[in-house]
């Protein structure tokens, strides 16, 4: 066979350290999938007890330690005053130069300017971005020109199956609210104030 020297670099999850930021429903689903690849799964979520993280086969860790240890960082936090710019210059400085960060949660959790700088300066290896601080993003957004970022237009949840599931869950939540409020999980609601719900 002719030797080919320009093979692309692919990376495995096998025995790699994955840091999940946010361990709600989506974070837990990500953990399940990472387990299938035999990854070491670390979780940072100050609102989830360590025993709950451990019972899902994951290792609880503080934010700084997790960022320093992780090969892959995946963000699954809600956007609020506490999580805005949750990842910025300081956090990028803690990461491995070989780390890959993925945000499919909300734009603004990762400071976009800091992300662009980290990618340009090879502070981190690469990023996957499904969400932006401004949506739709400006056509001149520097992320579009970087070779080490994979972008998608906030469509990570737009599979046919996912849309059907969301519609079914929304309808079931309405039924539960009208018939028996004890059946609905209010902890997942992000707009309780706007809905003026009496809980």
Name the predicted role of every residue range:
Residues 17-19, 101:
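Conserved hydrophobic beta-strands of the Rossmann-like cofactor-binding core
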Residues 23-24:
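Glycine-rich Rossmann-fold phosphate-binding loop(s) that bind the pyrophosphate
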Residues 98-199:
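Rossmann-like dinucleotide-binding domain for NAD(H)/NADP(H)
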């Amino acid at each position: 066979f002719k030797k080919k020297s320009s093979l692309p670099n692919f990376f495995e999850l096998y025995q790699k350290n994955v840091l999940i930021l946010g361990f709600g429903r989506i974070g837990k689903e990500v953990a399940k999938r990472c387990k299938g690849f035999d990854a070491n799964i670390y979780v940072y979520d100050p609102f989830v007890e360590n025993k709950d993280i451990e019972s899902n086969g994951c290792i609880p860790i503080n934010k700084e330690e997790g960022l320093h240890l992780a090969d892959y960082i995946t963000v699954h936090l809600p956007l609020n005053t506490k999580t805005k710019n949750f990842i910025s210059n300081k956090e990028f400085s803690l990461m491995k130069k070989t780390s890959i960060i993925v945000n499919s949660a909300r734009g603004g959790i990762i400071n976009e300017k800091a992300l662009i700088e980290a990618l340009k300066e090879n502070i981190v290896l690469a990023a996957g971005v499904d969400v932006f601080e401004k949506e739709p993003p400006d056509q001149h957004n520097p992320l579009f020109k970087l070779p080490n970022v994979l972008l998608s237009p906030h469509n990570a949840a737009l599979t046919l199956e996912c849309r059907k599931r969301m519609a079914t869950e929304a309808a079931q939540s309405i039924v539960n609210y009208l018939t028996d409020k004890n059946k609905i999980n209010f902890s997942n609601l992000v707009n309780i104030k706007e809905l003026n719900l009496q809980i």
